[in-house]
């Protein structure tokens, strides 16, 4: 399993789509010579860039086809959603992402692994000596944040995602979670002083049985 985060930058770095595809095929062949089944190529899809320098493909589905992707996923909800309020409710962002999932699952040829995002607050990465006001059009890390991302709401989206995955007998049985320890982006599963083990407990309660 090999996941490529910034696919346009990967292609650009190798010189062309054709060159990138050849490099992927060479690694795939090398894995098979080593006795493996080959490389499962997972490509991250972006709707809008978040970090400075990130690039977005104009046609994600075509890019995946031309590179021979085995699957795709997303890194975080906010690359596919909007944060209209300075403090945007978690459940609103969840519903936007679920609508995005409904769209791409019919557009992409390869299976799409849905993402579950714990939260989003990049304000710790701002200049702490200056006022932070956020704003719908503000650049990272001065963008709006997500609130109400409680363990209970996180558990709810885990249940929703599990139900959707199991409802499709031919669909994937995989998902991604953002994130284990992005403390300065407000998205972390690790135990903390506010909720303790609650996020991990929610994950265990939904998928541990």
For the regions a protein language model found, what residue spans apply to each?
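Glycan-processing catalytic domains of CAZymes
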Residues: 1-209
């Amino acid at each position: 399993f090999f996941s490529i985060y910034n696919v346009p930058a990967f292609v650009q770095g190798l010189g062309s789509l054709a060159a990138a595809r050849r490099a992927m095929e060479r690694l795939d062949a090398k894995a098979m010579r080593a006795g493996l089944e080959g490389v499962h190529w997972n490509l991250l899809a972006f709707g809008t860039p978040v970090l400075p320098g990130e690039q977005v493909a104009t046609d994600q589905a075509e890019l995946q086809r031309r590179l021979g992707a085995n699957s795709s996923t997303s890194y975080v909800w906010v690359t596919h959603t909007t944060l209209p309020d300075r403090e945007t409710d978690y459940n609103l962002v969840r519903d936007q992402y679920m609508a995005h999932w409904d769209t791409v699952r019919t557009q992409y040829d390869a299976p799409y692994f849905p993402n579950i995002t714990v939260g989003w607050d990049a304000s710790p990465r701002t200049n702490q000596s200056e006022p932070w006001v956020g704003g719908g059009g503000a650049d990272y890390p001065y963008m709006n944040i997500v609130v109400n991302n409680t363990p209970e709401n996180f558990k709810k989206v885990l249940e929703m995602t599990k139900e959707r995955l199991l409802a499709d007998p031919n669909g994937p049985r995989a998902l991604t979670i953002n994130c284990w320890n992005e403390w300065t982006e407000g998205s972390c599963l690790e135990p903390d002083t506010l909720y303790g083990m609650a996020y991990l407990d929610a994950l265990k309660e939904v998928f541990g049985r």
